[in-house]
């Protein structure tokens, strides 16, 4: 088989796996699209107080995030027990059920009684699927990609996420222009979760054509199958020699099996969890989820909120695409460090714009530059580093812990952002700018941790990275 066809196979498998990331991003747009209709159909009929209604409305987002945490915690066991591909298949089923279930909840169960709880259950299933793909998609891609292309391919996870989000924003915009706003709020909104279910079906069908990874097959003793796949993925290499290297890594780790998660020391786990958590602690989802509110606080009209959100999605898409081209040229560590410093600068500028009530172009430019820097650094590079830095023998345990830390940081950031942004005492002084100044400080802290604890993995095989951690223990 020619090298071109082997490269085509690797690319095809990476693209199939990356659909999980597409669904990840698409669901964030679904969250934005269904907010008002859910309030109208499932909460307003209950005639609650404003505070109680707001709390109940928040359950929909919380249900997704709880599902994300649960999925990421289970993904390690699922990936080991059923394989990376098997776990992705399960996630695709979650997306299908979640999408069509949420779209049909009102028709099947009405709006009263337990209808909202049923709707939240389907949103929980969506989160479950997101939690699994956020771990197993980069793992799958890293284990089928050659070392010199691995960074670019794994960064496709973030590329897929931002593509999914942008696609969802545009789909929501098209829905709003297809009919009146009354039609969207009455029934048109159902197409947002239903479209997610359709993408889930495509994901499921394509996964049925994909094999599992050689690393997992070797782990399960299925060397013959691993050899056949390696011969297709790397026709220039000796598959038996590659299997021996993979198996040697597992065997060395088994000698330290009593140490479990910390078989290679605590530093590798701390570094991985830190990279995952700081991807959220820099404030990206506070900016993305609350962009309309942020722009209104800056003095922009509410009628431009959707277009501003799309502009953020476009910038994120463009610069994430650039990152996928340069991550293997400049390395992971420099992009993370300089990205942290760039985000810190932009958050500091934005916070000061709020603080000193500076409107116009400067705050808008700082937001878009922040998104651009994130898209070129922590957005995609986080997934590259997480997929590479953990030795194979502990990846099944360490990767879910890191991703769970990421989701917990996401919940923490969003909760505290709402508290701080609504605090009269803080706003009297900082005028909604306090949170952004905190994000600036956290960005600097994240960069310092990367500089001290995260190794450069560019150009190294997974076995070489494992040996590096073993020698440093």
Swiss-Prot record:
Species, as recorded: Zymomonas mobilis subsp. mobilis (strain ATCC 31821 / ZM4 / CP4)
Topology class, membrane: Multi-pass membrane protein
Protein's name in the database: Glucose facilitated diffusion protein
Cytoplasmic face residues: 1-13, 81-85, 134-158, 209-257, 325-335, 388-396, 451-473
Keyword terms of this UniProt record: Cell inner membrane, Cell membrane, Membrane, Sugar transport, Transmembrane, Transmembrane helix, Transport
Listed transmembrane segments: 14-34, 60-80, 86-106, 113-133, 159-179, 188-208, 258-278, 304-324, 336-356, 367-387, 397-417, 430-450
Ranges in the topological domain labelled Periplasmic: 35-59, 107-112, 180-187, 279-303, 357-366, 418-429
PANTHER family found in the cross-reference section: PLASTIDIC GLUCOSE TRANSPORTER 4
Gene Ontology CC annotation, any one: plasma membrane
Upper classification of the organism: Bacteria, Pseudomonadati, Pseudomonadota, Alphaproteobacteria, Sphingomonadales
GO molecular function: carbohydrate:proton symporter activity
Family membership noted in the UniProt record: Belongs to the major facilitator superfamily. Sugar transporter (TC 2.A.1.1) family.
Primary site of residence: membrane
Purpose: Allows uptake of glucose by the cell; allows growth on glucose minimal medium by E.coli cells impaired in glucose transport. Also transports fructose, but has a strong preference for glucose.
Subcellular location: Cell inner membrane
Gene3D superfamilies: MFS general substrate transporter like domains
Top-level taxon in the UniProt lineage: Bacteria
């Amino acid at each position: 088989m020619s090298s071109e066809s082997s490269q085509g196979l690797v690319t095809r498998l990476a693209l199939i796996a990356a659909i999980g990331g597409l669904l990840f991003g698409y669901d964030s747009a679904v969250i934005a699209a269904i907010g008002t209709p859910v309030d109208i159909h499932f909460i307003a009929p209950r005639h609650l107080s404003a505070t109680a209604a707001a709390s109940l409305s928040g359950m929909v987002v919380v249900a997704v995030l709880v599902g994300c945490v649960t999925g990421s915690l289970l993904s390690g066991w699922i990936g080991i027990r059923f394989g990376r591909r098997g776990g992705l298949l399960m996630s695709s089923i979650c997306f299908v059920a979640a999408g069509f279930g949420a779209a049909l909840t009102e028709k099947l169960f009405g709006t009263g009684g337990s209808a909202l709880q049923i709707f939240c259950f389907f949103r929980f299933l969506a989160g479950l699927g997101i939690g699994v793909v956020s771990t197993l998609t980069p793992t799958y891609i890293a284990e089928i990609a050659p070392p010199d292309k691995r960074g670019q391919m794994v960064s496709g996870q973030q590329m897929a996420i931002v593509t999914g989000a942008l696609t969802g924003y545009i789909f929501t915009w098209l829905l709003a222009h297809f009919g009146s706003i009354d039609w969207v709020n009455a029934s048109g909104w159902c197409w947002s979760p239903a479209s997610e279910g359709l993408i889930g079906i495509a994901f499921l069908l394509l996964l049925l054509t994909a094999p599992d990874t050689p690393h997992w097959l070797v782990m399960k003793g299925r060397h013959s199958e691993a050899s056949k796949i390696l011969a297709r993925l790397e026709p220039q290499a000796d598959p038996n020699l590659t299997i021996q290297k993979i198996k040697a890594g597992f065997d060395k780790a088994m000698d330290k099996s009593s140490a479990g998660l910390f078989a290679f020391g605590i530093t590798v786990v701390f570094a991985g969890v830190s990279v995952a958590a700081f991807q959220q602690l820099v404030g990206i989802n506070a900016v993305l989820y609350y962009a309309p509110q942020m722009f209104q606080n800056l003095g922009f009209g509410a009628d431009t909120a959707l277009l501003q959100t799309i502009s953020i999605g476009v910038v994120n898409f463009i610069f994430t695409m650039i990152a996928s081209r340069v991550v293997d040229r400049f390395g992971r560590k420099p992009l993370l460090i300089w990205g942290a410093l760039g985000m810190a600068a932009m958050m500091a500028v934005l916070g000061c714009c709020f603080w000193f009530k500076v409107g116009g172009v400067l705050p808008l430019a700082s937001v878009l530059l922040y998104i651009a820097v994130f898209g070129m650094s922590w957005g995609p590079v986080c997934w590259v580093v997480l997929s590479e830095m953990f030795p194979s023998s502990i990846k099944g345990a360490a990767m879910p812990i890191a991703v769970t830390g990421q989701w917990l940081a996401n919940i923490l950031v969003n909760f505290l952002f709402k508290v701080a942004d609504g605090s009269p005492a803080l706003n009297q002084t900082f005028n909604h700018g306090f949170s952004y100044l905190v994000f600036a400080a956290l960005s600097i802290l994240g960069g310092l941790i990367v500089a001290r604890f995260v190794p450069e993995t560019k150009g190294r095989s997974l076995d070489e990275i494992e040996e590096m951690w073993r020698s440093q223990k």
